[in-house]
From Swiss-Prot:
This is Anthranilate phosphoribosyltransferase. The gene is trpD. It comes from Colwellia psychrerythraea (strain 34H / ATCC BAA-681) (Vibrio psychroerythus). GO terms for molecular function: anthranilate phosphoribosyltransferase activity; magnesium ion binding. HAMAP family: TrpD (MF_00211). The keyword Ribonucleoprotein does not apply.
């Protein structure tokens, strides 16, 4: 047994030693090489100088889908486990890479809440702000969501209210080994686009926004390699969301097929709004805006931004035959105020110890 482990470690070490020379020669890594390298990064086994060199070489060359997927699979495997579900159970995420610099309201987070209110199972994976004053974690914390809830509590939230939040730093402790290197480098690297791909709940449906159109195809192909069967990868005229101020470039993943699309607000039966109309603020300011939206009292532009992204999720779940029909469903649920009650239920459940809750339920019986 020990000799097998030693041989395996020796093989990984040999692989790591070939990675930088391969990249310096302008060649791509295969998925296994990328996986093994990032696996060692997460265990603290990679020298900071080598890590910085490899990240820089990947950046200069341009990361391939295999390199992205290999890293993502390694990171997800090393994450704190989320309770397994039945293979036929559908779970989705609505997430962006960040980095678009637009400082909009929290569109993807709010769309995820609305989608949960529409009956979809949403496991939202997120962090604090990257490209704005308020990230998904900042917003949900402002509402009172317990970011440090256990995986069991998060799973209970998902079962009870169709919604949970997985705070990235609570699941990906191995990132601490890369933190100082990333900070010293001061540039975007592969790590900046991995967040949407490493959700520990392993969603099988995704609405994934990217900050540049150059990432559309690589991220779509990487999603396929990580096992996602149904998704939209989108870039909306400068945003990592579906846009209202212009067209959205999209790649639809449909069971192995990649379909390039251009989507406009009119495809949802809506009109255009300016980017200025959906600008956000601090977490507290955004929380007030989101509370109005989810209670059915939001401004038209804010509502529309959330509706189009929620509608895309409904369409991917085959809850509607067209984006227009999906938008109508999202609009009806939004007007009902059910979105806010869904979020407030998440707040309540996230602050309960699921083990004690289950004990109380047994006692009641």
């Amino acid at each position: 047994m020990a000799s097998t482990s030693a041989a395996s470690n020796e093989l990984v070490s040999s692989t790591i030693n070939t990675i930088l020379p391969t990249l310096v020669d302008g060649l791509d890594l295969n998925q296994r090489q990328s996986h093994d390298f990032f696996q060692q990064v997460l265990q603290g086994n990679i020298d900071p100088a080598l890590m910085a060199s490899v990240l820089t070489a990947l950046k200069i060359k341009g990361e391939t889908p295999e390199e992205i997927a290999g890293a993502a699979i390694a990171i997800r495997a090393a994450a704190t486990p989320f309770p397994e579900r039945n293979k036929e159970d559908i779970v989705a995420d609505c997430v962006g890479t960040g980095g678009d610099g637009a400082n909009t309201i929290n569109i993807s987070t709010t769309a995820a809440v609305l989608a949960a209110a529409c009956g979809l199972k949403m496991a939202k994976h997120g962090n604090r702000s990257v490209s704005s004053m308020s990230g998904s974690a900042d917003l949900l914390e402002a509402f009172g969501v317990n970011l440090s809830m256990s995986p069991e509590t998060a799973n209970h939230c998902l079962a009870q209210t169709n919604l949970c939040f997985l705070y990235a730093p609570a699941y990906h402790s191995g990132f601490k080994y890369a933190g100082p290197v990333r900070k010293a480098m001061g540039i975007r690297t592969l790590f900046n686009i991995l967040g949407p791909l490493v959700n520990p709940a392993k969603p099988n449906i995704m609405l994934l926004g990217v900050y540049t159109p150059e990432l559309l195809m690589p991220m779509a192909q990487a999603l396929q390699l990580t096992g996602v069967k149904r998704a939209f990868v989108v870039h909306g005229s400068g945003l990592d969301e579906i846009a209202l101020h212009g067209n959205t470039q999209a790649i639809e993943i449909n069971n192995g097929e990649l379909i390039e699309r251009t989507i406009s607000p009119q495809d949802f039966g809506l009109k255009n709004y300016t980017l200025e109309e959906i600008k956000g603020g601090t977490p507290a300011e955004n929380a007030d805006i989101i509370r109005d939206i989810l209670s059915g009292q939001g401004k038209d532009a804010h509502n529309a931004a959330v509706i189009v992204n929620c509608a895309a999720l409904l369409y991917l779940h085959d809850k509607a035959e067209s984006l227009t029909q999906a938008a109508q469903l999202a609009t009806e649920v939004l007007a009902s105020g059910k979105g806010l009650s869904t979020l407030l239920t998440l707040v309540k459940l996230s602050n309960q110890d699921v083990s004690s809750t289950q004990t109380e339920l047994k006692a009641d019986k």
